[in-house]
């Protein structure tokens, strides 16, 4: 899936730009997907690359969407983040190099990980719209 990063960045709203391009964080419990339960795919708002599925989403009570794992580990980069007087692991999209959020080791099993991701860094594609939106190759992820 080809994309024009410069054009896509111009189309972002203020919060999406702040989060993805300036490593910002949106307010907890006041974002689009923190309590979203619909079945589907969460893709990078900039590149459109599939990052997470609803199957790996869980309620971590932190106010941001949380996932146990990405669809493909190769699509996310992890970097040391020492901002704000903390030591954390930042999660960035590999293709667009956009800030997504952070990963912590306090998630449920078997991974034990919690990918705490800003809604502003994501676009949701409902399962029944995957083919229509060009994500037919991801339908197998939802087969039981």
Swiss-Prot record:
SUPFAM superfamilies: Mss4-like. It comes from the Bacteria. One of its GO terms (biological process) is protein repair. One of its GO terms (cellular component) is cytoplasm. Residues 5-127 form the MsrB domain. One of its GO terms (molecular function) is peptide-methionine (R)-S-oxide reductase activity. Belongs to the MsrB Met sulfoxide reductase family. NCBIfam families: peptide-methionine (R)-S-oxide reductase MsrB. PANTHER family: METHIONINE SULFOXIDE REDUCTASE, PEPTIDE METHIONINE SULFOXIDE REDUCTASE MSRA_MSRB. This is Peptide methionine sulfoxide reductase MsrB.
């Amino acid at each position: 899936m080809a994309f024009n990063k410069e054009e896509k960045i111009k189309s972002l709203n203020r919060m999406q730009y702040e989060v993805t391009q300036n490593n910002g964080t949106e307010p907890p419990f006041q974002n689009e997907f923190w309590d979203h339960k619909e079945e589907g795919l969460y893709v990078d708002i900039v590149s459109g690359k599939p990052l997470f599925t609803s199957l790996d989403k869980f309620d971590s009570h932190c106010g941001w969407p949380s996932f146990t794992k990405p669809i493909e580990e190769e699509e996310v980069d992890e970097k040391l983040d020492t901002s704000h007087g903390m030591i954390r692991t930042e999660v960035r999209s590999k293709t667009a190099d956009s800030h997504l959020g952070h990963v912590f080791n306090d998630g449920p099993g078997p991974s034990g990980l919690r990918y705490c991701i800003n809604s502003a860094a994501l676009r949701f594609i409902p399962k029944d719209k995957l083919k229509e939106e060009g994500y037919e190759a991801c339908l197998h992820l939802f087969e039981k």
